[in-house]
Every structure is written in C-alpha cells, then in structure tokens.
Amino acid sequence: MPTCPLDQSENVNFFTEKNSHKIYRCQQCGLIFVWPLPSDAKKLYSKDYFEGAKNGFGYVSYEAEKQIASGTFNAFLDAIEKILPQRGKLLDVGTATGCFLEIAQKRGWEISGLEISQHAVDKACQKGLDVKIGELSDASADKPAYDAITFFDVFEHLPSPKETLQKAYNLLRQGGVVAINTPNSKSLPAKIMGRQWYAVNPPEHLRLFDADNLKNLLELSGFEIKSVCRIPKKLSLSYVLTVLANHRKSRMLKKASNLFSKAGIGSWLFPLSFKGNIFILAKKR
C-alpha cells in the first residue's frame, strides 16, 4: 500500500480505479491521489488536449472556452489585487495558451508564464507573451523575484505539490501571494457523485484536495491564509457536454456537443460551477 504524499500517513484506503490507474484516499488528511504516478503524464498535453480532446481529455477549443472564462479570470485578479493593489510581477504556472496572462497584462501586471506543453507555449508566444516551456522547479532566480504566483486549474495536475509550494515560497518576495484554484474534494458535487466525480480523472488529475488539507499544506510551507472561497465560472453548453462526454466515455454526448456547436447554441453560457472548485489566497510570511 502507498503512503500519503502530503502527510506520509500509511492510513490510506483504496478509492477507485480509472483509466488503468489506482486511486487512494488518505484517511488522515483526506487527500485523494493516484499511485503509482504515471511515468508519461506530460505526453497528455499535446495539441489534441487544447484543440479537439479526441483522446478523452482536455478541450474541444481551449481558446474559445478560456475567452468565455475572462470574467472568472478578472474575479481572480480582483481578489489578488485586494491584497496587492500595487500589482507587480506575476508568474502564472500552467499558463496554457496565455488567456489569463493577457488579462493580467491589461490590468497592469508585469507578467510571465510557465507551461509544459510546447504547443501551448507556441500559441502564447504568438500573442507576444513571455511564456517559457517548463515547470516551476525549472524557474531560477538569485533572489525572490515575484509578487504573485498563480496556479489556476493546475494544482490537481501536479505530481509534487509540496515541493512546488516550497519553490513558490522561495521565488516570492516578502508579502507576495500565491493563488490557487482547484477542484474541492469536499464540495457538494464531489460528495454527490463520489467516485464518478468529474475530477477523478487520471492521468490528467493526480492530486485532489479539500480546503483543510490545502490550507494546512500552505501553512506548513510558510504561508498565511488570506482568503478561502469559491469563484463560480460561466460554462458554455459545449464545454459542459464535452466534460460529461469525456468523463462518461459517451459518444452520444460528444455528438450532441458538436451538433450544438454547429447550430450556434454551444456557446450559450450558464453562470454556475458544477465542478465544485475552491479558490485560496495565501501570503508569504
């Protein structure tokens, strides 16, 4: 049996198996995690992940969906700017094609991003954005260089969240903030759907947190919790159907998504968050 990657507890139970990956839940801290970790998870983030989702993961059109999410990105920045009204240098981890960075730049932030997908990096650079291939562990600085480091819909993909937060702490200036938006394993949708919850989706999602264990991890990493909330998203009809189709492996839902998109109603928006995400802001002590 594995040990919990957060608290090293051996009190873990088998949770489920999906996509040929075993998933466990720590009975001490509640973390849901994949074990053993897949060795080739990075291969998932090819062009198909951002344009097509033919292999059952990702987006039909990441650019279209993230443009829809501009209101959510602005809400994230509103929360950050309550703590850092002067703005400053912002590093976005897992920046994809740079939709969030475009908005942050327009609001006066000095932006940069990291992304493991070469396809996404190329798209972001075509927009004139400062985005480099790599992970946070690849970032280097002689001294703390950033005022904010963001992980939006990224933390659940990370194989080593503890090490990632320690690196973020070292890269942040005193009083800098880390912002995380990630699925909440204690949310109402998670409780209702159980093992069928959309976020239980390896090898895409490797670690699923709740507010308590994520706050504890941040505090142990040297951060002071400033805000814990849920920021709803406006989701398009096509996106909702695509997520459900991928999760249920349903050709019928996939066809419905494509049909509605061609009919022009796939872009209809719903101001809700069936995903049950959690948004946490923490400040470097």
Predicted region positions:
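A SAM-dependent methyltransferase catalytic signature shared across enzymes that methylate proteins
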Residues: P5-V12, D212-C229
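Short, glycine-/aromatic-enriched active-site segment of Class I SAM-dependent methyltransferases
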Residues: I180-R207, D212-L218, V240-A245
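Short N-terminal helix/helix-N-cap motif within the alpha/beta-hydrolase-1
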Residues: P159-E163, A190
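Conserved N-terminal segment of class I S-adenosyl-L-methionine
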Residues: M1-F152, K162-L165, R230-I231, V243, ...
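A C-terminal cap/extension of S-adenosyl-L-methionine-dependent methyltransferases
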Residues: P2, S227-R285
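A short glycine-rich, Lys/Arg-flanked "PGG" loop and its adjoining helix->strand segment in the class I
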Residues: K162-V177
